[in-house]
Structure formats: structure tokens, C-alpha cells
């Protein structure tokens, strides 16, 4: 055999079987950076139609987690696939750099501004800290194989971006959407600042739930409303609340106008009294109050009780009964304690009735000095004292501990309060912003489509947006207000542009350094500078304008796609929609795609305390970024994305299958020069034509899946092709022809041409997902080519070949099915020790007329398809008793061990082995391939 071994075309490639990704990927990254790969891609798409995916900026604080990786990898897959489709798809990563979390980190290091350090110095420290965080995160993102303008990202703290944020606010003002008001806002007493909706998390909390009686100022008159004359006992209206600390700010009792309310009399502790309760809640309430028997004196609608007055339980004034749509009978008494300074619904209904917006609570959550009974106490600690006072006054009907969902600060994880403070708001309704935003939502494509109804509900129900914060590190609200009237300066828009010009040169510190007289001249004494900063959600929400509209690589095209986690409907998607609609009357995006959160194998959130956190850095250092990228692509991101070590190891197994396929292709293209060896598709062996046609059809399916952002479909189709049509069928069949046919002969070159087309197509299919591996394959493909696959478009060499009808796709699928049945029977014969390998087998196929015609069409080449030394086709009716039934009703099989001699070169057992004297151990086919013109293959 040693003499003939060198006549075989054995596969050879530098592409290693083991990826060794953790070590090789960083080397590739160095080359990408050195070669300026991102700029090469940009240069290759000059003048093409833009596709703009705008990066939602992660916060510049801490290391990236697996959720960040999912987000960036999904974006990278889209950008690369759009580039492959011929678009000019720049990717400019960004970071959110202002705000409280950075302030808190810097405070730990240098103290609060105004203590050991000035506010200006504090801002500079914040800027330095954010820059350090950006650098750390940037390296981690680059390690994932994400291509972008990493050396020139956008930062919300860039002077130019800070200036453009101010300019965007001036447009919002110009459009009439900004107003100042005293309204209850989410307030964190630990932050000492208002919070945005997106900065609020809901966690379970135990609160005191109390039922409180408000005695009527005129009980006889109130009883008369229920048809009871000359009533002589006290009548009380009862509220239920879980925030006793808000009772000092109570200014009304809210009822539902259409709800039925009952006047219920009972005796307790020797005292007869009557309570007003929602009719449907009477039984549950009296059970809470341990009332065993009662009498319903009368019933009336809530509307009949409007403006009836009741005594505040411990303060010296009366409060009216008012009507509100927010009152329900889900819990409590059907009557709502109303404190306009401590609740959004309370505020809205209070405005209708002109109620005082009382706020006895300071920034730190402590009652102000003039608060009767509770001055100087923290509101949450005062709850017990409020309850004790109510008990003392005889107003407490019930008190229990109540577990419920309650808003918490996203940063401190502590309960927050609603608190009325003077703030700046973007109005939802004064100039039709809500209505227009809802129209724009309809014009946007939401992926998955449930995103539309989700954000619609949020926009329908959201309050005005409080955009002001009382912080140090943030973009200032650069306004001058009249000291007496609190009105904006009439030239606010032009003044803001002048301030923006200064910020563009000096950063936000320019505002605090500014002497009002520099801009206002003699008017300076009449106005004061606003010291509030913008909500950081305004910073990121305005980047469609402050960044995309400002950077030249976006060509003024506008944004095609926003892509973030599903929590961003109330976050970045919402803030961007509000600002863009306020500025321009339209949404800032055409498509919005959301992905689910990452959870562990048991569906639990990642948590350090549980110990189920999977850090992307650990994955890339152990398995490589391509494994992480494959997991992201293969997971349906529309729901929760499950990840664990076991799941990642399965991804590694799937990766190996793709890698092994690529290695087979490259190894068998050794010595192939497409410039001179490529066989035209129409001249190929039929099986080669078929596989090229399958690849062409698959490419269309893969491109469509990429276009629809269905990356799990891409990976499914790719794995199916590698495993079934290639691995189990085509590649298995062509090994014999590839290794044993004449090196330069048509049979082998036809096969290599098909492999070349598949490799050229496949390297592009995998490039958006398995970027490192695609680059590795690309460098080893034969033929003249550009330096990188990432500058290419989808492969154009796959012609959709029209096969003869007898060799249609269905025909080859039928042969694949037959081959699978033959393999089963051969495998059983192997287990029974009747044969060794499949080439020791002779197979007899008993087939019906239709199948017989199909099988005999390719003549003697059927044995190559079946990987047997001999294949005979006989009528199904002639099947012997030993014939094995198959899952195909039209086919029975007999497998026998060949009695013919084994060819030393191709290992086929053939009767003609030894018939040629010069090569006594070879079959005639091998002799032809060694010394003659090479065998002729027509079909397989």
C-alpha cells in the first residue's frame, strides 16, 4: 500500500481541528486593529444605502455582564449581516456618563461636593471616573469580536454631546412642551433627588395597613344623604392606607361617583356609631373591625356625597369628600385618602378641586420643622407614631402588617416616597405630545410585535415627565427664570444656544462658571440661573439628535433600528420617543427590537448570592468569544435567554460541528486554484450540481432570516445543512471521489468546485455570528481575495441551477432517505459481526417500480451514493424472506458480505481486482485514476 498511498489525494490544511479560540482570538483582534479593519469596512461601503443601528448607551460604571454581551453581540450580528447585504452600516458605540451612580462612587473617594472638594472639582473627578469605566468596558466589548468605531465612540459627557443635549432641550422649549410645576414625583430620600420612572424598581415591602375614621363635621346632614332623618350618632367616612406617614398631608377623601356607598350602624364598646363604606366591601371591612352585628341604614351613590366635609383625625381642619376615577374596590374601603403632595392620582384629582398641594416632608425624608406632632422625624420611622396618635384620637379602626409590592430606588434598593417639589416637566398633554407619540408608535415596527401594545399602554398612562434632578454631575438645565414671577426669560432659546456654544468648548462646567451678566447684561439682577440638572434618561434619550444627527458617518439618514433589553420600553425607547416627538413631531426610529433577560438553567435571574452568575470574561477566557456569540445567535431572544455552563458546552459542541465542516472543506480544497480549476456549474457531476443548488436555496433562506433578525433560524439551518445534507450525505459520498479520483480529473475538480462554492458561501453565512472563525477560514481559502470577509457581500457564485426533472431536489432527497435505510441495515450487520465497514457490504435493494426507476437511473454509481462495494436493484415482488423491511414501504433490503477482493487503494471489494497485471492489488477504476485519463462520473 505504501506505493499507492502517495497516489491518493489526501486532505491537507493549516486550519486546526481544535479552535483554541481563547488564545487565538486575541491574536486576531490585534491584526484587526493593526489593519484598521473597521475603517476598511467603511471604505468598502462608501456611497451605499445607509443602515443605522443606534447604540443605546450602557452606563459607564462597573464591569460588563452577560446581558451587556447579549446586547452588543446581537447588534454586531445585525451590523455585519447588513454590511454583507451591501448596506453602509456604521456602528458607533456609546456610553451614558452622567448621573447618580457615578456621583456615589466619586463621593466614596473624595466626599460630597462642597465639603472637602468644590462642585467643579467634583465634576472633574466624575469625568475622570467615567472615562476609566468606559475604557474597561470598551476592552471587554472589543474582546467579544464586536466591530465598531471603538476609538471614537460617543460619550454623553463629550463636550459636543453635552452642548447638543442643551440644544435639544431648547427645541423642546421652543415647541412649548416644557413647564415648571409643583408635582409629586418619585423621590429617593437617600439620593435627595427625584427619580425617573426607569430608575424605580418594585420590590416587596411590609407596611402598616390601617383603617382610619374621619368623623363628619355635620353627622346629621351626612346621614340625611342616606335617607336617614335626625340621626344623633357620629358618622364617619373610613379610608384604608399603607402610608400612614402621608396623613399629615391629607386634604380630601376620594369616592367613585357611580359606586354605591352604605351607611352602616353598629355598637362597639358601648358606643353607637355609623360608618360610610363601599357597599361591596361592607362585610370584609366590618370583619376587620371585629364588628359582629350591624344595620345598613341606607345606600347612596358616591356623587351624592361630593363636597361633604369631615374632620381631619388629628389636625385642626376639615377635608372634603371629592370624586375621582381612580377609586376602586380592589382593596380597602372604597374611599381613598387623598394627599395631593404625595401621589400622582391624588395630585390630578386635587387639581380639579383646587386642593392645597401640601408637602410637609424635606429632601431627606424628614418632616419639616413646622409639621405638627412629627417635626424632625423620618417619614418611615414616623409611621408607628402616626398609628399611635390615631389610636389615641379614637380614629384607628384596624392596624395590621401588610406585605405588598412597593417602589424602591434602583441604586440604593431602599423604599422611595412620592413628594411634591418644584420641578421641570415635559408635558404630555399641553401640546398634544401624548397623542402624537401614540400615532408614532403605530408607524414603528416593533419586534416582537407585543412591544407595541406594551409601550402604548405606558404612553397612555404615563404622567408628565419630570426631567429635572437636584444633582451635581449632569447636564445643566440652562435656563434663566424671573426672580419674582418664576417665568422663563423671553429669549431663552437664543440664550441656550449661546450657552451651548460655551459648553461645546468647556463642557458643562461652563454653565456653573457663567456670570449671568455676561449674557443678560442689565437684566441679570432680575433673573436667577436654574441649578437643576437633567434626568440622565434625557441625556441618552436625546442622542438621536445630539449624536446621530451630528456625526458625519450617519449621513443625516436618521435611525433605522433601536435594539435593547425589554426593560427599555419604559426607559430608552420611551425617553427617545418623547424627546423626538417633542422636537420633531416624529419617532426617532423605524424599528425597535427587544431581547429578553438572561436567566440560568433553572430560569432564575443572575445573582451573586445564588452563585449563578456567568461572566462573559470567564466564557471568553475559557471557551472563546465565538462560543458565546453562537449561544446568543442560537437562542430565541424574544423571551428569556437561558444560559449555564452546560448550555455553553452544548454551544461548543455545535461549534465543533461547524468547525469540522469548514475544516473538511478547506482540507479538500488543497491544491485547488479557482482561477484555472473551477468547473462550471452546468458541467458538474449531478450530485455536485445538486449540492450547489441546495446551497443557493439555503443562502436565500439564511439572508431572509438575517433580514428578519431571526438569528436562531440562521443557526438552525446552518447546523441542519452541516449535519444532514453535508455531513451525513454529500461529504460522506464524495470522500471516495475526492481521495481516489485523478487529481486533475473532471470528477475531482467538479467536486472541489462544489466545495469551493460552499466554502465561499458558508464563510459569509457564519461571519456575522462566528466572526473569528470566519476570518480564520477566509485567510485559508484558495484564490485571490480581499483581506477580510467582513468587507464582502453575500456570495454571488451560487447559481440556482435548473436540474433535469429526473434529478430534482426531490430525487436526491429520495436517495438520501434510501441511504439512511441502507445505513441502518448495514449498522445492524456490523453489530452482528457479519461485516466490518460498509465497503465490505454488497446490498440488494428490492424496490417497487417507481423507486426502481429512480435507483437504476444513476446505474453503477448508486454504490457510491450508498457507500457500498456493490448495489443491485431488483423488483420488490422478488424480495427474499431474509429481506429486511424498512420505513419506506417501497423498499426492502438484503446486506451481505462481499466475496470479492479488496482494492488496496480505494478499499472497494471488486471482482476485477487483480485483472490488470501491472497492478495486481487494484481495481480497474483505481488504475484508470493513476495511469489513465481518470474515471468518468456523471451522477455521484
UniProtKB/Swiss-Prot annotation:
<feature type="binding site">
    <location>
        <position position="906"/>
    </location>
    <ligand>
        <name>Zn(2+)</name>
    </ligand>
</feature>
<feature type="binding site">
    <location>
        <position position="926"/>
    </location>
    <ligand>
        <name>Zn(2+)</name>
    </ligand>
</feature>
<dbReference type="InterPro" id="IPR001412">
    <property type="entry name" value="aa-tRNA-synth_I_CS"/>
</dbReference>
<dbReference type="InterPro" id="IPR010663">
    <property type="entry name" value="Znf_FPG/IleRS"/>
</dbReference>
<protein>
    <recommendedName>
        <fullName>Isoleucine--tRNA ligase</fullName>
        <ecNumber>6.1.1.5</ecNumber>
    </recommendedName>
</protein>
<dbReference type="InterPro" id="IPR013155">
    <property type="entry name" value="M/V/L/I-tRNA-synth_anticd-bd"/>
</dbReference>
<keyword id="KW-0436">Ligase</keyword>
<dbReference type="InterPro" id="IPR023585">
    <property type="entry name" value="Ile-tRNA-ligase_type1"/>
</dbReference>
<feature type="short sequence motif" description="'KMSKS' region">
    <location>
        <begin position="605"/>
        <end position="609"/>
    </location>
</feature>
<dbReference type="GO" id="GO:0002161">
    <property type="term" value="F:aminoacyl-tRNA deacylase activity"/>
</dbReference>
<keyword id="KW-0030">Aminoacyl-tRNA synthetase</keyword>
<comment type="similarity">
    <text>Belongs to the class-I aminoacyl-tRNA synthetase family. IleS type 1 subfamily.</text>
</comment>
<dbReference type="InterPro" id="IPR033708">
    <property type="entry name" value="Anticodon_Ile_BEm"/>
</dbReference>
<dbReference type="GO" id="GO:0005829">
    <property type="term" value="C:cytosol"/>
</dbReference>
<feature type="binding site">
    <location>
        <position position="564"/>
    </location>
    <ligand>
        <name>L-isoleucyl-5'-AMP</name>
    </ligand>
</feature>
<keyword id="KW-0479">Metal-binding</keyword>
<keyword id="KW-0067">ATP-binding</keyword>
<dbReference type="GO" id="GO:0004822">
    <property type="term" value="F:isoleucine-tRNA ligase activity"/>
</dbReference>
<feature type="binding site">
    <location>
        <position position="923"/>
    </location>
    <ligand>
        <name>Zn(2+)</name>
    </ligand>
</feature>
<dbReference type="GO" id="GO:0000049">
    <property type="term" value="F:tRNA binding"/>
</dbReference>
<keyword id="KW-0547">Nucleotide-binding</keyword>
<dbReference type="Pfam" id="PF00133">
    <property type="entry name" value="tRNA-synt_1"/>
</dbReference>
<feature type="binding site">
    <location>
        <position position="608"/>
    </location>
    <ligand>
        <name>ATP</name>
    </ligand>
</feature>
<keyword id="KW-0648">Protein biosynthesis</keyword>
<dbReference type="InterPro" id="IPR009008">
    <property type="entry name" value="Val/Leu/Ile-tRNA-synth_edit"/>
</dbReference>
<dbReference type="InterPro" id="IPR002300">
    <property type="entry name" value="aa-tRNA-synth_Ia"/>
</dbReference>
<feature type="short sequence motif" description="'HIGH' region">
    <location>
        <begin position="58"/>
        <end position="68"/>
    </location>
</feature>
<dbReference type="InterPro" id="IPR014729">
    <property type="entry name" value="Rossmann-like_a/b/a_fold"/>
</dbReference>
<comment type="function">
    <text>Catalyzes the attachment of isoleucine to tRNA(Ile). As IleRS can inadvertently accommodate and process structurally similar amino acids such as valine, to avoid such errors it has two additional distinct tRNA(Ile)-dependent editing activities. One activity is designated as 'pretransfer' editing and involves the hydrolysis of activated Val-AMP. The other activity is designated 'posttransfer' editing and involves deacylation of mischarged Val-tRNA(Ile).</text>
</comment>
<comment type="subunit">
    <text>Monomer.</text>
</comment>
<keyword id="KW-0963">Cytoplasm</keyword>
<dbReference type="Pfam" id="PF08264">
    <property type="entry name" value="Anticodon_1"/>
</dbReference>
<dbReference type="GO" id="GO:0005524">
    <property type="term" value="F:ATP binding"/>
</dbReference>
<feature type="binding site">
    <location>
        <position position="903"/>
    </location>
    <ligand>
        <name>Zn(2+)</name>
    </ligand>
</feature>
<dbReference type="GO" id="GO:0006428">
    <property type="term" value="P:isoleucyl-tRNA aminoacylation"/>
</dbReference>
<dbReference type="InterPro" id="IPR050081">
    <property type="entry name" value="Ile-tRNA_ligase"/>
</dbReference>
<dbReference type="InterPro" id="IPR009080">
    <property type="entry name" value="tRNAsynth_Ia_anticodon-bd"/>
</dbReference>
<dbReference type="GO" id="GO:0008270">
    <property type="term" value="F:zinc ion binding"/>
</dbReference>
<dbReference type="Pfam" id="PF06827">
    <property type="entry name" value="zf-FPG_IleRS"/>
</dbReference>
<keyword id="KW-0862">Zinc</keyword>
<dbReference type="InterPro" id="IPR002301">
    <property type="entry name" value="Ile-tRNA-ligase"/>
</dbReference>
Amino acid at each position: 500500500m505504501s506505493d499507492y498511498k502517495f497516489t491518493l489525494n489526501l486532505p491537507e490544511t493549516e486550519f486546526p481541528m481544535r479552535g483554541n479560540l481563547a488564545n487565538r482570538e486575541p491574536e486576531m483582534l490585534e491584526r484587526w486593529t493593526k489593519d484598521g479593519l473597521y475603517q476598511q469596512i467603511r471604505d468598502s461601503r462608501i456611497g451605499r444605502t445607509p443602515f443605522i443601528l443606534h447604540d443605546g448607551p450602557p452606563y459607564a460604571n462597573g464591569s460588563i455582564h452577560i446581558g451587556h454581551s447579549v446586547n452588543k453581540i446581537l447588534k454586531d450580528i445585525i451590523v455585519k449581516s447588513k454590511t454583507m447585504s451591501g448596506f453602509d452600516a456604521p456602528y458607533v458605540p456609546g456610553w451614558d456618563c452622567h448621573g447618580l451612580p457615578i456621583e456615589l462612587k466619586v463621593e466614596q473617594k473624595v466626599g460630597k461636593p462642597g465639603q472637602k472638594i468644590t462642585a467643579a472639582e467634583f465634576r472633574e473627578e466624575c469625568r475622570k471616573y467615567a472615562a476609566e469605566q468606559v475604557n474597561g468596558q470598551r476592552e471587554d466589548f472589543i474582546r467579544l469580536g464586536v466591530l465598531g468605531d471603538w476609538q471614537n465612540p460617543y460619550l454623553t459627557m463629550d463636550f459636543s454631546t453635552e452642548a447638543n443635549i442643551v440644544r435639544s432641550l431648547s427645541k423642546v422649549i421652543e415647541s412649548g412642551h416644557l413647564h415648571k410645576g409643583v408635582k409629586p414625583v418619585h423621590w429617593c430620600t437617600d439620593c435627595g433627588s427625584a427619580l425617573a420612572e426607569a430608575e424605580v424598581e418594585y420590590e416587596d415591602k411590609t407596611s402598616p395597613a390601617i383603617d382610619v375614621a374621619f368623623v363628619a363635621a355635620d353627622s346629621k346632614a351626612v346621614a340625611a344623604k342616606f335617607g336617614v332623618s335626625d340621626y344623633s350618632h357620629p358618622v364617619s367616612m373610613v379610608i384604608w392606607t399603607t402610608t400612614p406617614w402621608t396623613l399629615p398631608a391629607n386634604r380630601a377623601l376620594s369616592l367613585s361617583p357611580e359606586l354605591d356607598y352604605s351607611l352602616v350602624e353598629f355598637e362597639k364598646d358601648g358606643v353607637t356609631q355609623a360608618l360610610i363604606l363601599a357597599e361591596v366591601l361592607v362585610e370584609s371591612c366590618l370583619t376587620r373591625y371585629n364588628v359582629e352585628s350591624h344595620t345598613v341604614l341606607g345606600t347612596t351613590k358616591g356623587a351624592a356625597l361630593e363636597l361633604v366635609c369631615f374632620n381631619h383625625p388629628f389636625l385642626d381642619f376639615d377635608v372634603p369628600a371629592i370624586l375621582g376615577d381612580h377609586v376602586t374596590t380592589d382593596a380597602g374601603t372604597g374611599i381613598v385618602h387623598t394627599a395631593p403632595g404625595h401621589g400622582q392620582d391624588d395630585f390630578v384629582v386635587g387639581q380639579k378641586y383646587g386642593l392645597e398641594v401640601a408637602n410637609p416632608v424635606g429632601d431627606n425624608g424628614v418632616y419639616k420643622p413646622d409639621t405638627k406632632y412629627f417635626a424632625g422625624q423620618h417619614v418611615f420611622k414616623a409611621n408607628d407614631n402616626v398609628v399611635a396618635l390615631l389610636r389615641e384620637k379614637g380614629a384607628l379602626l384596624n392596624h395590621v402588617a401588610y406585605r405588598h409590592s412597593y417602589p424602591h430606588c434602583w441604586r440604593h434598593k431602599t423604599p422611595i416616597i412620592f413628594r411634591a417639589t418644584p420641578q421641570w416637566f415635559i408635558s404630555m398633554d399641553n401640546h398634544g405630545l401624548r397623542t402624537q407619540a401614540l400615532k408614532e408608535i403605530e408607524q414603528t415596527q416593533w419586534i416582537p410585535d407585543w412591544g407595541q401594545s406594551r409601550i402604548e399602554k405606558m404612553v397612555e398612562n404615563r404622567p408628565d415627565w419630570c426631567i429635572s434632578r437636584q444633582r451635581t454631575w449632569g447636564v445643566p438645565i440652562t435656563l434663566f427664570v424671573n426672580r419674582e414671577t418664576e417665568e422663563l426669560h423671553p429669549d431663552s432659546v437664543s440664550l441656550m444656544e449661546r450657552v451651548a456654544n460655551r459648553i461645546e468648548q468647556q463642557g458643562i462646567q461652563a454653565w456653573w462658571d457663567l456670570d449671568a451678566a455676561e449674557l443678560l447684561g442689565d437684566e441679570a439682577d432680575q433673573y436667577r440661573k436654574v441649578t437643576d440638572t437633567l434626568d440622565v434618561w434625557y441625556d441618552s434619550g436625546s442622542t438621536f439628535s445630539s449624536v446621530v444627527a451630528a456625526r458625519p458617518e450617519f449621513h443625516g439618514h436618521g435611525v433605522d433600528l433601536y435594539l435593547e433589553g425589554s426593560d427599555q420600553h419604559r426607559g430608552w425607547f420611551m425617553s427617545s420617543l418623547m424627546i423626538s416627538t417633542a422636537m420633531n413631531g416624529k419617532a426617532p426610529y423605524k424599528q425597535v427590537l427587544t431581547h429578553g433577560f438572561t436567566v440560568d438553567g433553572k430560569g432564575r435571574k443572575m445573582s451573586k448570592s445564588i452563585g449563578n452568575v456567568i461572566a462573559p470574561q470567564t466564557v471568553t477566557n475559557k471557551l472563546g468569544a465565538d462560543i458565546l456569540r453562537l449561544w446568543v445567535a442560537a437562542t430565541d431572544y424574544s423571551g428569556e435567554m437561558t444560559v449555564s455552563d452546560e448550555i455553553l458546552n452544548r454551544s461548543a459542541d455545535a461549534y465543533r460541528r461547524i468547525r469540522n465542516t469548514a475544516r473538511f472543506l478547506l482540507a479538500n480544497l488543497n491544491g485547488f486554484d479557482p482561477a484555472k480549476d473551477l468547473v462550471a456549474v452546468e458541467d458538474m457531476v449531478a450530485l455536485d450540481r445538486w449540492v450547489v443548488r441546495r446551497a443557493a436555496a439555503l443562502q436565500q433562506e439564511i439572508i431572509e432570516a438575517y433580514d428578519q433578525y431571526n438569528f436562531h433560524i440562521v443557526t438552525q439551518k446552518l447546523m441542519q445543512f452541516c449535519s444532514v445534507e453535508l455531513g451525513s450525505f454529500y461529504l460522506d459520498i464524495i470522500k471516495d471521489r475526492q481521495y481516489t479520483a485523478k487529481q486533475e480529473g473532471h470528477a475531482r475538480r467538479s467536486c472541489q468546485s462544489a466545495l469551493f462554492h460552499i466554502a465561499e458561501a458558508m464563510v459569509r453565512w457564519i461571519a456575522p455570528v462566528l466572526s473569528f472563525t470566519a476570518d480564520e477560514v477566509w485567510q485559508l481559502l484558495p484564490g485571490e481575495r480581499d483581506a477580510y470577509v467582513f468587507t464582502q457581500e453575500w456570495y454571488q457564485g451560487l447559481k440556482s441551477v435548473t436540474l433535469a426533472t429526473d434529478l430534482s431536489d426531490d430525487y436526491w432527497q429520495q436517495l438520501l432517505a434510501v441511504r439512511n435505510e441502507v445505513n441502518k441495515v448495514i449498522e445492524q450487520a456490523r453489530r452482528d459481526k457479519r461485516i466490518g465497514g460498509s465497503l465490505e457490504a454488497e446490498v440488494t435493494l428490492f424496490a417497487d417500480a417507481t423507486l426502481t426507476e429512480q435507483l437504476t437511473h444513476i446505474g453503477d454509481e448508486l454504490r457510491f451514493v450508498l457507500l457500498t462495494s456493490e448495489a443491485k436493484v431488483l423488483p420488490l415482488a422478488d424480495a427474499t424472506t431474509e429481506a429486511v423491511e424498512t420505513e419506506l414501504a417501497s423498499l426492502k433490503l438484503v446486506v451481505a458480505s462481499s466475496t470479492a477482493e479488496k482494492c488496496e487503494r480505494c478499499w472497494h471489494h471488486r471482482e476485477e481486482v487483480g485483472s490488470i497485471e501491472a497492478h495486481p492489488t487494484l481495481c480497474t477504476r483505481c488504475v484508470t485514476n493513476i495511469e489513465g485519463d481518470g474515471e468518468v462520473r456523471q451522477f455521484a
